[in-house]
């Protein structure tokens, strides 16, 4: 169990490091960090947390930085994220929280 926690921490560190590296302009090194994190995830059979999974393109492993490597569009309550490197698109349905309108 302790090993899985260490692997998960390392995966998160690598993805965050990739994001920082991409902001500085070195996309190739950032891709390598993400590929390494993916490999750790597969070998250790550990899921990458959703927050971090959405930080990179699943096709070319480029960190998605809005305005630099990613374009975001909203069309009829659907968020469309497009990687500007490989044109990969991912769509997310935008919905209101159902619990926010409840009365006490």
Swiss-Prot record:
GO molecular function per UniProt: ribonuclease P activity; zinc ion binding
Role description: Part of ribonuclease P, a protein complex that generates mature tRNA molecules by cleaving their 5'-ends.
The protein's Enzyme Commission number: 3.1.26.5
Assembly, per entry: Consists of a catalytic RNA component and at least 4-5 protein subunits.
Cofactors that this protein relies on: Zn(2+)
Family: Belongs to the eukaryotic/archaeal RNase P protein component 4 family.
Protein name: Ribonuclease P protein component 4
